[in-house]
């Protein structure tokens, strides 16, 4: 069996590594399920990073063939680090689905093989990851989220995963709070000139904030009663800056310690309300409803397909 450390120490996406893994998997498929799953998870992460890079302008002042080469190598290193240890959870999910001793629950949807061979990944490596997934995943699950919501989750899902790994805040809680505070990105706080503030989490501009601010009318609760008040909120240059500031706010402030150590997203939601993040007395319940909705959709997607090691090679 090939160890994870050996795979990660090598050039994990070169042909030699894949051929070696293919040979080992053919000899003993059951013993090599985990390294195969790790390899596939790594390729998915690298493809996501590449899709993000492709969306950026390529004619900047510091853009050249050399910088693009170094960026590609850097992305490979990031992908390797992200899939080390627990990774993003994709590999573990595949291991559970491909291990006979751990069958899916009886009430799950009948499994349909996911037609996603390795040749497809290699042949269409320049194709957007979302297009590949759309072709591979069956369409017979009940998706109750509207289109704008799905686009919002797709944009923030990977950054939320990274922020969760760095801070300890459950990633479903990060997504749910961003969705609740911004109305799935459709009702986010605006600047005076109408431009977006990128303030996804409704963070107010307290006395120690030195950046730009915007003042809006918002709803606050006093003794359980809703009131309209004027309040100043922080303004960011991007969603990533907003996410970084949000994580820093929770990790640096001792009163949010229960949020960063919460065992589940639902417990984290209650910890946020207990710490006084929002004045809404129903804040935790609203977050929990969104968290459960997101988890339900994820479960329905995962139960509609299964992966077989023979179909990967």
UniProtKB/Swiss-Prot annotation:
Gene Ontology molecular functions: amidase activity; hydrolase activity, acting on glycosyl bonds
Annotated SMART domains: LYZ2
Out of the domains of life, which is the source?
Bacteria
Which stretches does the entry tag as region Catalytic?
Answer: 148-313
Q: What is its main location?
A: periplasm
| GO BP: any one term | cell wall organization
List cellular component terms (GO). Answer: periplasmic space
EC identifiers of the protein: 3.2.1.-
Tell me which UniProt keywords the record has, alphabetically: Bacterial flagellum biogenesis, Cell wall biogenesis/degradation, Glycosidase, Hydrolase, Periplasm
- Residues at the active site: 220, 245
InterPro entries found in the cross-reference section: Flagellar_prot_FlgJ_N, FlgJ, Glycosyl_Hydrolase_73, MGlyc_endo_b_GlcNAc-like_dom
Q: Which Pfam family is one of those matched by this entry? A: Glucosaminidase
Which top class of enzyme applies to this chain? hydrolase
Q: Spell out the subcellular localization from the entry.
A: Periplasm
Misc note? Probably exported via the flagellum-specific export pathway.
Stated family: In the N-terminal section; belongs to the FlgJ family. In the C-terminal section; belongs to the glycosyl hydrolase 73 family.
**Job description of the protein:** Flagellum-specific muramidase which hydrolyzes the peptidoglycan layer to assemble the rod structure in the periplasmic space.
What PANTHER family has UniProt attached to this entry?
PEPTIDOGLYCAN HYDROLASE FLGJ (PTHR33308:SF9)
Q: What is this protein called?
A: Peptidoglycan hydrolase FlgJ
The species this protein belongs to is: Escherichia coli O157:H7
């Amino acid at each position: 069996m090939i160890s994870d450390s050996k795979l990660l120490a090598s050039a994990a996406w070169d042909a030699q590594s894949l051929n070696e893994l293919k040979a080992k998997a053919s000899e003993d498929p059951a013993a090599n399920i985990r390294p195969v799953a790790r390899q596939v998870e790594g390729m998915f992460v690298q493809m996501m990073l590449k899709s993000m890079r492709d969306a950026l302008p390529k004619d900047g002042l510091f853009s050249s063939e050399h910088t693009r080469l170094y960026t590609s190598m850097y992305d490979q290193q990031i992908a390797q680090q992200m899939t080390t240890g627990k990774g993003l959870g994709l590999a573990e999910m595949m291991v559970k689905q491909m291990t006979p001793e751990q069958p899916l629950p009886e009430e799950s949807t009948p499994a349909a093989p996911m037609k996603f061979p390795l040749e497809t990944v290699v042949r269409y490596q320049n194709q957007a990851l979302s297009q590949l997934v759309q072709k591979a995943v069956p369409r017979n699950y009940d998706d109750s989220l509207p289109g704008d919501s799905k686009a919002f989750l797709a944009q923030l899902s990977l950054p939320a995963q990274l922020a969760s790994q760095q801070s300890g805040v459950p990633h479903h809680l990060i997504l749910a709070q961003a969705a609740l505070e911004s109305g799935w990105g459709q009702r986010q706080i605006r600047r005076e000139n109408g431009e977006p503030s990128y303030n996804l989490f409704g963070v107010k501009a307290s006395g120690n904030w030195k950046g730009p601010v915007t003042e809006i009318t918002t709803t606050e609760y006093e003794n359980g009663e809703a009131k309209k008040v004027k309040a100043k909120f922080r303004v960011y240059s991007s969603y990533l800056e907003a996410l970084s500031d949000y994580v820093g706010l929770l990790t640096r402030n001792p009163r949010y310690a229960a949020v960063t150590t919460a065992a589940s997203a639902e417990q984290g939601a209650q910890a946020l309300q207990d710490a006084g993040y929002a004045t809404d007395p129903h804040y935790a319940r609203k977050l929990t409803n969104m968290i459960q909705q997101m988890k339900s959709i994820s479960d329905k997607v995962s139960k509609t397909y299964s992966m077989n090691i023979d179909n990967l090679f």
